[in-house]
């Protein structure tokens, strides 16, 4: 069940990063910044980071073990959400960039390492079933519950129908997500 809740972190960031960055268009001081005008390019840094971080997995698993790698992943989610909450597309754009880089660690160290762990720790006779269960729990149930829960938080703090800037609401939303990810470390 812990995997279901941990997978929610991934759904939170993937579902709301672009609307969050785009919401800065309503703030005059940020409307013409790189972070607003190139939100998709900024978000694509996450994919680059993910591609590079996957290469680190054999090294970190060998040197730190699966428990520490999973802990690093959860702390990376906390950092990613916290940086989103503190950053802005102006002078704080570096926090967004760092958040995109941290995403690779958060995603790969949890999902890929978890899948490798299941592969290495299960008997060959049940390995495919175990992998299937892992995928259902993370990408199926976890993704669904995560998306619904994250939307409830966004709906609570951000008025998506308002033309007024929603920066405070978005910041609070990201801090709630960071707190949630931090609480999962104890599961």
Give the location of each predicted region.
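Intracellular juxtamembrane helix-capping segments at the cytosolic ends
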Residues: 109-122
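Loop-to-transmembrane helix entry/capping segments in MFS-fold secondary transporters
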Residues: 36, 124-135
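Short, small-residue-biased leader/transition segments that mark boundaries at the very start
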Residues: 1-5, 187
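Helix-loop boundary and gating motifs at the non-cytosolic
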Residues: 10-26
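Helix-to-loop junctions at the C-terminal end of transmembrane segments
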Residues: 53-66, 154
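C-terminal ends and interior cores of transmembrane alpha-helices
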Residues: 76-89
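A membrane-interface helix-boundary motif in multi-pass transporters
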Residues: 152-180
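Loop-to-transmembrane helix entry
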Residues: 27-47, 95, 172
């Amino acid at each position: 069940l812990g995997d279901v809740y941990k997978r929610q972190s991934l759904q939170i960031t993937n579902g709301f990063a672009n609307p969050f960055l785009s919401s800065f268009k309503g703030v005059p001081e940020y409307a013409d910044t790189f972070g607003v005008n190139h939100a998709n390019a900024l978000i694509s840094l996450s994919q680059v980071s993910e591609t590079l971080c996957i290469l680190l997995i054999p090294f970190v698993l060998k040197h730190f073990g699966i428990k520490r790698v999973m802990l690093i992943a959860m702390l990376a989610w906390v950092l990613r959400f916290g940086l989103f909450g503190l950053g802005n597309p102006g002078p704080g754009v570096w926090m967004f960039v760092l958040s995109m880089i941290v995403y690779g660690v958060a995603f790969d160290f949890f999902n890929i390492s978890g899948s490798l762990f299941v592969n290495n720790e299960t008997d060959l006779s049940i390995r495919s079933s175990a992998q299937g269960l892992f995928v259902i729990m993370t990408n199926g149930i976890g993704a669904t519950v995560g998306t619904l829960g994250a939307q409830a938080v966004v709906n609570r703090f951000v008025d998506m129908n308002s033309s007024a800037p929603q920066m405070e609401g978005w910041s609070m939303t990201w801090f709630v997500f960071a707190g949630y990810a931090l609480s999962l470390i104890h599961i």
